[in-house]
């Protein structure tokens, strides 16, 4: 019941009259999932070593779900090529803001640039699943409303 109330509250936030579509570095292709899960990681990051096994376990449950999983690996400090990935995914502004930081997964709306939630090592597997489920519902509802 609490999960449903949380989802409805989140949906209300995004369907409010002041909802504004942000401009991005080009429109995302229509076949790309709206929900983006962007992992900022490196091999030397302690938080990454805690978070990543949890994400991998949970990710298996979401094969075929409308989630675009993107991974930015800052292990060698090289940023060349990573921004190209961000541009291709339509999330360059997010990358520009967070490049070099590690140890978290950003759940965001590709079309508006809205960051829904930042998942850290403090999240357990169940909390990660709840976050993914919550924002999948929101993005699906946004698409259905916008498609009318």
Regions found by a protein language model. Name each.
Residues 19-35:
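A short beta-strand-turn-helix
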Residues 64-84:
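Thiol-based oxidoreductase modules, predominantly thioredoxin-like and allied folds used
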Residues 49-63:
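Typically the conserved alpha-helix immediately C-terminal to a functionally engaged Cys/Sec
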Residues 99-143:
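Non-catalytic, surface beta->alpha helical segment in thiol-disulfide oxidoreductase systems
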Residues 2-19:
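Hydrophobic membrane-insertion alpha-helices, especially the h-region
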Residues 31-45:
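Short active-site neighborhood of thiol/selenol oxidoreductases, capturing the structured segment around
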Residues 77-112:
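Structural alpha/beta surface segment adjacent to cysteine/selenocysteine redox centers
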Residues 45-49, 105:
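The canonical Cys-X-X-Cys-His
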